[in-house]
From Swiss-Prot:
GO biological process: tRNA N2-guanine methylation
EC number(s) per entry: 2.1.1.216
Region: Disordered, residue numbers: 1-26
Gene: trm1
Organism whose genome encodes this protein: Methanocorpusculum labreanum (strain ATCC 43576 / DSM 4855 / Z)
Function according to Swiss-Prot or TrEMBL: Dimethylates a single guanine residue at position 26 of a number of tRNAs using S-adenosyl-L-methionine as donor of the methyl groups.
NCBIfam families with a match to the protein in the record: TRM1 (TIGR00308)
Catalytic activity: guanosine(26) in tRNA + 2 S-adenosyl-L-methionine = N(2)-dimethylguanosine(26) in tRNA + 2 S-adenosyl-L-homocysteine + 2 H(+)
Binding site for Zn(2+): C237, C240, C257, C260
Name by which UniProt lists this protein: tRNA (guanine(26)-N(2))-dimethyltransferase
């Protein structure tokens, strides 16, 4: 196969050449290298440099670039696994060339995780991570990192597929990006609590075609109970933008929308707890200033968003609110400022360019939009 030399971060490796004219992903080469996931890898490398797990498993590695970078840039022992023999040949070639404490295995990911344990496990499959979560929930000692690229089922666009895979009810709401991330994390939490284990999210986000979450795995029964208490539902009005959060419930409690008088519908179960460990994100932000990554500007922007966002479980798209009100959308910064001045913490959100995360109720947001229109669009 035709290969080329590539550098990501401070790591140089060899990867197969992809035919960019064919469907991508999964690409045309025998072994897949996804250039579009460099940001994902950069963020994980930076996080791993901060938390320093004892070791790391790249469970479905393909070219192995993620594990190679962790070994080279975070300087911890790494196991890189793939069940494809051609992939393993490339990984071994790169590992020998790179040096460092790297073990390479050719095995089914579930079988490997059923027979070995690792301090940190990274699941980055093509599609859903669900088939691997059970084994990973038992095999990960302290850290579990998970990517899902099946965004349509998680966001509710492919409703039945989302129900089947995640045993949850997705809804294609205006805040569907956060629903998708929280539904994936809710599934992670439910897998862990089965084994009397809990989780504490460190770094979680949505970007383009995937969701990504890095969590601490906690081994005590009390942690499992605390994790279970963070599972819940968003109850959404099917006729308007009203929603309410229900945390700590394994079944949804129906309510009547105070605006429309119709019964709300459940979204979930979802992870309703914090998405970030902001002390770690602050350390990442400080460290990033002295480091070089190919996606450094994107990383800086993402960390700034994540550090600022309030811990609400949904966001509002103020363009959709304005459209429903049949008025012009206000200037975003002026809307945010007016809500903060009213005593409700409000920021932009990484989930949506026209989204705001706020502790304010919907009627107040509508009032601020109406006032802005009255002030700025007078004839």
């Amino acid at each position: 196969m035709e290969c080329r030399e590539i550098t990501e971060g401070s790591t140089t490796f060899t990867a197969p050449v992809q035919d960019e004219t064919t469907q991508f992903p999964p690409g045309s080469a025998p072994v897949f290298y996804n250039t579009k996931m460099e940001f994902n890898r950069d963020m994980t490398v930076l996080l791993t440099k901060i938390v320093q797990p004892e070791d790391y498993l790249d469970a479905m590695a393909a070219t192995g670039v993620r594990g190679l970078r962790i070994a080279n840039e975070a300087k911890i022992p790494v196991t890189i696994n793939d069940r494809d023999e051609q992939a393993v040949k490339i990984i071994k070639y790169n590992a020998e060339k790179l040096g460092g404490d790297i073990s390479v295995t050719c095995d089914d990911a579930n079988r490997l995780m059923c027979t070995s344990r690792f301090d940190s496990i990274d699941l980055d499959p093509f599609g859903t991570p669900v088939p691997f979560l059970d084994a990973a929930s038992r095999a990960a000692k302290h850290y579990l990192f998970v990517t899902a690229t099946d965004t349509a089922p998680l966001c509710g666009a492919h409703f039945k597929a989302g129900c089947r895979r995640y045993f949850a009810t997705p809804r294609n709401t205006e805040y569907h990006a956060e629903v998708g991330l929280r539904m994936m994390m809710g599934t992670m939490a439910r897998e862990l609590v089965k084994y009397d284990r809990g989780m504490k999210p460190i770094l979680s986000y949505a970007k383009s075609h995937y969701f990504r979450s890095h969590v601490r795995v906690l081994g005590k029964v009390t942690a499992a109970d605390e994790t279970l208490a963070q599972i819940g539902f968003v109850m959404q009005c099917p006729k308007c933008l009203y929603r309410e959060e229900q945390k700590g419930s394994l079944y949804p409690k129906m309510h009547i929308c105070p605006h429309c008088g119709v019964e709300t519908v459940p979204v979930g179960p979802l992870w309703m707890g914090p998405l970030q460990e902001k002390e770690i994100l602050a350390e990442m932000q400080t460290a990033l200033a002295e480091l070089q990554f190919g996606t450094k500007r994107q990383m800086e922007k993402m960390l700034t968003f994540l550090l600022a966002e309030p811990e609400t479980c949904t966001y509002y798209d103020y363009h959709i609110i304005s459209r429903n009100m049949k008025v012009s959308p206000p200037n975003m910064e002026e809307l945010i400022a007016s809500l903060n001045e009213a005593g409700y913490y409000t920021t932009r959100t990484h989930f949506c360019d026209t989204g705001i995360k706020t502790t304010a109720p919907l009627p107040l947001i509508e009032e601020k939009i109406r006032l802005w229109n009255a002030k700025n669009l007078q004839m």
